[in-house]
Design a protein with these regions (language model features):
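C-terminal lobe and adjacent flexible extensions of AdoMet/dcAdoMet transferase-like proteins
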Residues: 212-254
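SAM-dependent methyltransferase
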Residues: 149-218
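A conserved beta-strand element that flanks and buttresses the S-adenosyl-L-methionine
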Residues: 116-118
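Conserved class I S-adenosyl-L-methionine
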Residues: 3-49, 51-59
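Class I SAM-dependent methyltransferase SAM/SAH-binding core
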Residues: 60-105
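A short acidic, Gly/Pro-enriched loop at the edge of an enzyme's catalytic core
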Residues: 107-114
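A short glycine-rich, Lys/Arg-flanked "PGG" loop and its adjoining helix->strand segment in the class I
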Residues: 132-144
Length: 254
């Protein structure tokens, strides 16, 4: 990339709001931000089946609000007070219950027919132990017959050049982005560089990528069983070429 910029690196630091503080919350709903795919709310409303839904990483309510408008009672868990404040400021946001905390371990009152984690949010838990704990926590909150849905990418390690660990995912005049992988630990960090008036600002956020079969084992350890796995929200088949999956595990009734 032939662009000269003045130094302006800012690394996201863990604090009260984790890596998703006011700086990210302020632009999370910008028109250029990743949008919710069509069909998401339809699928979630169907799975809720008239019961309560629990959203992990509820954020600014981009999914919870339209789901609540469909008549589904939604409760959310989120570590970021800055994100929750944005939710509260939206029409209808004050009617959605939110518990502030780490969704791997935070408990809430009551049980749910549906719990869900979308847009790669399971990867915000940066250790395998935390991801396993999340499944156990959700299983304890589900009613018998209730479902746990996760939407997450399939790790695209085929794009890694031999001997390298960096994969670019966006390049434009305004911003650039790349992921750095550690295939030994499944740790990755997502780097975002924004160019404003010739100045570059750098943001880095850690994640842990996870394989479908690994998620199935986590579910099994929590007493859940796989019900469906699709290649996307259109319920297309999941294949070796799929770049994401929507997986649903069910809590047995017996």
């Amino acid at each position: 990339m032939r662009r000269q910029v003045r130094s302006g690196t800012v690394r996201a630091m863990e604090g009260e709001d984790g890596y998703f503080g006011e700086r990210i919350a302020a632009t999370y709903d910008d028109p250029s931000s990743e949008l919710v795919e069509p069909g998401v709310v339809d699928v979630l409303a169907e799975l809720a089946g008239g019961g309560r839904a629990l959203e992990l990483g509820i954020g600014t309510g981009r999914i919870a609000l339209p789901l609540a408008q469909r008549g589904v009672p939604v409760h959310g868990i989120d570590l970021s007070r800055a994100m929750v404040a944005r939710l509260r400021a939206k029409p209808g946001g004050d009617a959605i219950g939110v518990t502030v905390g780490d969704f791997a371990t935070t408990t809430v009152h009551g049980t749910f027919t549906l719990a869900y984690l979308v847009v790669n949010t399971i990867m915000n838990l940066t250790t395998q132990e935390e991801q396993v704990a999340c499944f156990g926590n959700i299983a304890a909150h589900l009613e018998p017959g209730g479902c746990f849905l996760i939407e997450v990418m399939v790790p695209d390690l085929r794009r890694l050049p031999p001997g390298q660990n960096v994969v670019p995912f966006h390049v434009s005049q305004q911003r650039a982005g790349f992921d750095v992988y550690d295939v030994a630990t499944q740790a990755m960090s997502s780097h975002h560089i924004t160019f404003v008036d010739g100045r570059g600002e750098h943001l880095s956020i850690p994640f842990r990528y996870v394989w479908p079969a690994e998620l199935d084992l986590m579910a099994q350890l929590a007493g859940l069983r796989l019900r469906d796995r699709w290649g996307g929200w259109g319920r297309e088949p999941f294949t070796s070429q799929s770049r994401q999956h929507v997986s649903i595990w069910e809590k047995p009734t017996g």
